[in-house]
Amino acid sequence: MLLEEDPSTLIAHTTQNFNITPDRHAVSRVAESLSTLQQARDLRLRESETNLKKLARTLNTLQSQHQEVTSSHSSAEHASLISRLDTQKFRVAKNVSDLEMETERLQTQLAELQARLQELELQGVDGGDASAAGGATSTGENNGNGSAGNGGQVRSVEDEVLLRLKVYRSLGIEIEREEQDGGEFTRAVVRNDRRGDVCVVNVDRHRFSRFFYANYFWQTL
């Protein structure tokens, strides 16, 4: 039996029957896996720390910039600036409107002065007196001609008026006559088909000359 055998012999046989090589290989593989995992973990940890430091620096930079912007541009100053700029904008717009109105007034005055200048140039230095004298002379000479000559002159005047009215209509100007003014032409309707405008002008010979109205009609057309 077992007790009768030599213990050393039993131990030797037991040792020979044990096969621990596969276990040792398994333990080695587990140790290598643990080492690889530890290295990978350390690498990811270092990368995470590096990214965290970068994000921290970016955050500090953005916070500094935000503080600078906030300190240099307060909401009260911004509102005050906007209000001041709005006031300046309205003031400039009003000045522009006033200047446009003044320009229109000066243009009208310039047209009146130009018309007056043309009238004076056409009349000449003694034009008014000469025309008056000529009119008086022709009146004296025509007093003895008789009713036949007067009738021919009336027809000639009517033909001239009709011709003028026809010319005006061809230009887009309608001349109207009012009965309460003694049958004189006192109103002109100027139509500009190109712009689609209609302008009504009250003709007052005592206020403006015919040259002024002629220039005004041309400018309107």
From Swiss-Prot:
Coiled-coil regions listed in the entry: 42-127
Keyword Glycoprotein in record: no
CDD domains xref list: RWD_Spc24
Subcellular location: Nucleus; Chromosome, Centromere, Kinetochore; Cytoplasm, Cytoskeleton, Microtubule organizing center, Spindle pole body
Family annotation (Pfam families): Spc24 (PF08286)
Residue ranges, annotated region (Disordered): 126-153
Keywords annotated in UniProt: Cell cycle, Cell division, Centromere, Chromosome, Coiled coil, Cytoplasm, Cytoskeleton, Kinetochore, Mitosis, Nucleus
GO-annotated cellular components: cytoplasm; Ndc80 complex; nucleus; spindle pole body
Positions with biased composition (Low complexity): 126-145
GO biological process: cell division; chromosome segregation; sister chromatid biorientation
Annotated SUPFAM superfamilies: Kinetochore globular domain
InterPro entries membership: Ndc80_Spc24, Spc24_Fungi_globular_sf
Name the record gives this protein: Probable kinetochore protein spc24
Organism whose genome encodes this protein: Neurospora crassa (strain ATCC 24698 / 74-OR23-1A / CBS 708.71 / DSM 1257 / FGSC 987)
Source lineage: Eukaryota, Fungi, Dikarya, Ascomycota, Pezizomycotina
